[in-house]
Amino acid sequence: MIEKETQILQLLSYETSMQKKRAALDLLADADDIAFLIHPLAYRSSWEFCAKALFFIEDARLEPHLPELLAWVEALNDEGSELVEFRLQDMQASMLLAPLETFILQHRDSDSLDWYFGVSRLAANGLIYPRLSRETHAVLQQAEQKVK
């Protein structure tokens, strides 16, 4: 991780003032890559504000990182996961469809249902659900039955 990215993550910590968080957003405006904002394991104290920063990043910049963002949504108890889910709900359905379908199919044989709780609202989107494959519908229905 480069020095500027480390500085941004440190400034986004819940322990820093809002003024410092604003400074982090200013630095972020010039960042070439945003991958360092996505669930940075070494900066747990920054997760919530990293997720909030993602609200200001356009869909096209988020699109290459959708698998990692969906994994964050799956981590239900992690700070920021619900915020990331809200951000993805606002994303263009055409961008979200393929990565979401891949994510769901990867969890077809999972014993844990955390993935389902994390992405079920995304999959239920009226623009996405009808476009999912039969196989993906079956996986979602099977998970829903396990929940009941």
Spans of features found by a protein language model:
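Short, intrinsically disordered/low-complexity patches at protein termini
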Residues: 104-107, 120-122
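Amphipathic alpha-helical scaffolding segments comprising HEAT/armadillo-like alpha-solenoid repeats
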Residues: 1-10, 30-41, 59-72, 93-105, ...
